[in-house]
Amino acid sequence: MIMTLCIFTLTACGGSDDANAGADTEKEAMTTLVFGTSADYAPFEFMYPDENGDMVYGGIDVEVAQYIADYMGVKLQTENMSFSNLLTALNKGQFDIVLADIEATDERKEAADFSDPYLTEPAPHFLVKKENADQYKTYADFEGKTIGAQTATTKLKIISEIPNVNAVSLQSVLDLIKEVSYGKVDAILVDGSVAQQYQETNDDLVALTFDELGSSAEVCVAVAKGDPKGLLPKINEAIAKLTEENKIEEFKANAAALADVLQEVSAPEEDSEA
């Protein structure tokens, strides 16, 4: 009876080891890391024409994702969709990771798990037309104005709390840029780095920030809730390495070098309603 029990125990343990080994093999068998983003948010993620005229992905987050894939020894596959759908698609298994200048807020932590931060983002900035910039000396000057922000972002929540504001929510930052450039909204609110990028590439826009908009935020990589593929340890190792190598500054410089190309791509087209 004792011998039978021992044999059963050993068999059960062996089966468990085999199962764990199989799970480890499955993780190790990953050959492609699928990266989800919303490529309309320079300098983090955007599309631009390469030397052959083909549209390709560029930006800080794109380079971080490639660095992580290289560290893991796998290929990177980029998938583009609207920002508001990214975390839902992530949990449906459409992506392995999401990078889109995402702050790991408490609300988002309910929908996904997050890596260690790889970048600190300046406080949000308003973008307004240069000819109107003198109207906005204080945060209170935005009360009662029509202000746009990207759908499902913390910026939309911020503008919704401004007294008597008419908040406009759009999926695309490029559409927001057109709205403020054409005077269809008084201002838009975006992340600090994004505002600075568009100010540099659009002569008619000015970036403004105020203490009421808060302080800096930490930007992280998102994985599906519970990290079912066990990706976070390797991702955090890669982030530690790129931080040690000061790669973010290199990636920022690379994005800035594309400013002229980006200006041609992102500049609003003239239309009859302008």
Segments predicted by a language model, with ranges:
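C-terminal motif of bacterial Sec signal peptides marking the signal peptidase cleavage site
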Residues: 8-12
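Ligand-binding clefts/hinges and TM-proximal coupling segments of bilobed small-molecule sensing domains
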Residues: 15-21, 154-168, 206-211, 239-274
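Extracytoplasmic small-molecule ligand-binding "clamshell" domains
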Residues: 22-102
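Bilobed "Venus flytrap"/periplasmic-binding protein-like clamshell domains
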Residues: 39-42, 55-70, 125-173, 192-194
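Periplasmic-binding protein-like
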Residues: 39, 120-128, 196-239, 259-273
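Acidic, polar ligand-binding/catalytic clefts
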Residues: 62, 75-141, 206, 212-213
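Extended ligand-binding regions for polar small-molecule ligands
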Residues: 14, 62-71, 130-132, 151-153, ...
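A ligand-binding cleft/hinge motif common to bilobed small-molecule-binding domains
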Residues: 85, 102-111, 158-161, 186-216
